[in-house]
């Protein structure tokens, strides 16, 4: 029973979602030549760091979690694990994760993990989430760290491919998160969390969602245009972007914003999973010249 509680407080669903993106970034950079020990070290290292961040987040959010229907039954809210024990647990998870990334992968991968962790726990959870409408934007940077860590674990450098991955996953986080805030509007309102739909209104949030999906679409295409992924990835990226944008535009005419937002959120998971899979398997380009160079 205790094992289940210690697992729940790490938010395993979030860990799993991040692992998919780590694999995408890692295999994209590997280009078919996979270093399996490095692969395992990277996956486990990132998992532990994400788990640590989630436990710290649960500790920090105890007060607001009590006010939200979705989170009122979390382990720390119900007192199933003491706050002091959760801090020790989170610290041990983080230390183990950073050590694995440093010694098993490379220092760059570890530092990227540290930066993502500090942004999520120190900047987003401790301050921005409670005090600024821009909290989601800041949080998106930490959410984009895992695929970049996976990529840089292989390359050992932060190149344009890593920058494109950072852009793709950061931009994806915005409509994904705003959709959650719309269909969980009352929860965020009750907890006094200043997310965009609550502060500026759902109509404004819809405009932001549309613009971010357009920016996301452009960023996804850059992986192929920059010579990092192939034509199959390009086709899938274009298809999911167009479909997601179409769903966003239909939001201006819907009768029930909550139902629409749930569908938009659901497809966001499908979209980012499809991209992660495609960049994993379609990493080859036709020749040494990039598609972007061919266009010019």
From Swiss-Prot:
Organism phylogeny: Bacteria, Pseudomonadati, Pseudomonadota, Gammaproteobacteria, Enterobacterales
Record-annotated disulphide pairs: none
Pathway info: Porphyrin-containing compound metabolism; heme O biosynthesis; heme O from protoheme: step 1/1
CDD domains in the record: PT_UbiA_Cox10
Name of a matching Pfam family: UbiA
Cytoplasmic side: 1-9, 57-78, 127-197, 248-268
Family of this protein: Belongs to the UbiA prenyltransferase family. Protoheme IX farnesyltransferase subfamily.
PANTHER family: PROTOHEME IX FARNESYLTRANSFERASE, MITOCHONDRIAL
An example Gene Ontology CC term for this record: plasma membrane
Entry-linked InterPro entries: Protohaem_IX_farnesylTrfase, UbiA_prenyltransferase, UbiA_prenylTrfase_CS, UbiA_sf
Known function: Converts heme B (protoheme IX) to heme O by substitution of the vinyl group on carbon 2 of heme B porphyrin ring with a hydroxyethyl farnesyl side group.
Swiss-Prot/TrEMBL catalytic activity: heme b + (2E,6E)-farnesyl diphosphate + H2O = Fe(II)-heme o + diphosphate
Residue spans crossing the bilayer: 10-28, 38-56, 79-97, 108-126, 198-216, 229-247, 269-287
UniProt keywords, alphabetically: Cell inner membrane, Cell membrane, Heme biosynthesis, Membrane, Transferase, Transmembrane, Transmembrane helix
Membrane topology, from the record: Multi-pass membrane protein
EC numbers: 2.5.1.141
Keyword check for tRNA processing: no
Annotated GO biological process: heme O biosynthetic process
Enzyme class: transferase
UniProt-listed NCBIfam families: cyoE_ctaB (TIGR01473), PRK04375.1-1 (NF003348)
Protein name: Protoheme IX farnesyltransferase
Origin: domain of life: Bacteria
GO terms for MF: protoheme IX farnesyltransferase activity
Principal subcellular localization: membrane
Entry keyword Glycoprotein: no
Something else known: Carbon 2 of the heme B porphyrin ring is defined according to the Fischer nomenclature.
Regions of this protein lying in the Periplasmic compartment: 29-37, 98-107, 217-228, 288-296
């Amino acid at each position: 029973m205790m094992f289940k509680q210690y697992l729940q407080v790490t938010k395993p669903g979030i860990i799993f979602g991040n692992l998919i993106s780590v694999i995408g970034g890692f295999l994209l950079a590997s280009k078919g030549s996979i270093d399996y020990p490095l692969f395992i070290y990277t996956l486990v290292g990132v998992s532990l760091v994400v788990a640590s961040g989630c436990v710290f987040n649960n500790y920090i959010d105890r007060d607001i979690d009590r006010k939200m229907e979705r989170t009122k039954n979390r382990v720390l809210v119900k007192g199933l694990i003491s706050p002091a024990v959760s801090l020790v647990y989170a610290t041990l998870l983080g230390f183990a994760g950073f050590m694995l990334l440093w010694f098993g992968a490379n220092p760059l991968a570890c530092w990227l993990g540290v930066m993502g962790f500090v942004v999520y726990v120190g900047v987003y959870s401790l301050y921005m989430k409670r005090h600024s409408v821009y909290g989601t934007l800041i949080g998106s940077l930490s959410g984009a760290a895992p695929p970049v860590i996976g990529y840089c674990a292989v390359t050992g450098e932060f190149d344009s491919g890593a920058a494109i991955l950072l852009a793709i996953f950061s931009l994806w986080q915005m409509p994904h998160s705003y959709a959650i805030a719309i269909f969980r509007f009352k929860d965020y309102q009750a907890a006094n969390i200043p997310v965009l739909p609550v502060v500026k209104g759902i109509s404004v949030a819809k405009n932001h969602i549309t613009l971010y999906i357009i920016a996301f679409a452009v960023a996804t295409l850059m992986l192929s245009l920059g010579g990092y992924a192939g034509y199959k990835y390009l086709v899938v990226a274009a298809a999911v972007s167009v479909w997601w944008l179409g769903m966003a535009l239909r939001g201006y005419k819907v009768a029930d914003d909550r139902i629409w937002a749930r569908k938009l959120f659901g497809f966001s998971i499908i979209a980012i999973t499809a991209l992660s899979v495609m960049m994993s398997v379609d990493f080859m380009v036709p020749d040494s010249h990039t598609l972007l160079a061919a266009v010019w």
